Amino acid sequence: VVFVIWEEKAEEPILPMRLFKNHTFTLTSLLGAVIGAGLFGAVIMLPLYLQIVKSNSATAAGLKLIPLMLGIVSMSIFSGKQITTHGKYKKFPIIGTAIMTVAILMLTTLTRSTPYWQLSIYAIIVGAGLGLSMQTIVIALQNAVDYHDMGVATSANTFFRSLGSVFGSAIFGAVLNNRLAHYMASGFSNLAHKDPSVMSTINITPAGITNMIANPKSVPLVVHNTALDAYTNAFHIVFFTAAPITAFGFVLALMLRELPLRTSHDYAVAREEAAGEAIG
């Protein structure tokens, strides 16, 4: 609130509040936050899944996210070329957020035995959705604001995307920890009823569970699998939580207005006018 009041009074505000009167600026800012949350939800949770459930090292988990980046890069290039050729951009964030929502729901099917090729397909699809959306909304934003506001508007969009990633990471992390505790308690309780002797030999404190994940041979196989199932189920809930967020992004994309793309001549005229105002 203090920031908004201060910006309203400032002669040269960091983020002019009048920009929020621009329909496209407001929508793309919200879309940026949604995409940031979706991006970091995938980027953070997938490596955790690979390290914990699939027993990959941090380096291997990072390398196995290359398909995600391939999806982002390839679809960013594709959408950029299509926009340049046809001058239409609205359909890309609509398609992109729809693909992201479907792909994140597909991630809820991951199990302990899911092969890497299947995960790669899911990652490519998530990346494709991000690639179709992420840069397209920046184009829509830059096309909708005045030339002299383009820099601050673009920076603001990046800020809101970062803000979305921060809140997304916090929300998804909280959901993961909450559901993990629930599934761990439930899984080990069921195991105790089936075989009390097994449970008496293990440490189910947080430190003990961390050790059992890192050193699977230190505990009976059934105990280790119970812990992995708890993690897998917790990841499912995280992805189920992320899907409505990206679905909300789809609704926002539908509301985006498609304005005629500016030409290089338009920008040249705007620069001349801005230079004239500065001299005057």
Regions inferred by a protein language model and the residue ranges of each:
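Structural signal for alpha-helical transmembrane segments and their membrane-water exit/capping regions
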Residues: V1-A10, V175-R179
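Hydrophobic alpha-helical segments of secondary membrane carriers
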Residues: L31, A156-F160
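Sparse recognition of residues in long alpha-helices and their boundaries
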Residues: G62, I66, A98, N157, ...
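Hydrophobic transmembrane architecture of multi-pass small-molecule transporters
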Residues: A140, R161-R257, T263, V269-G280
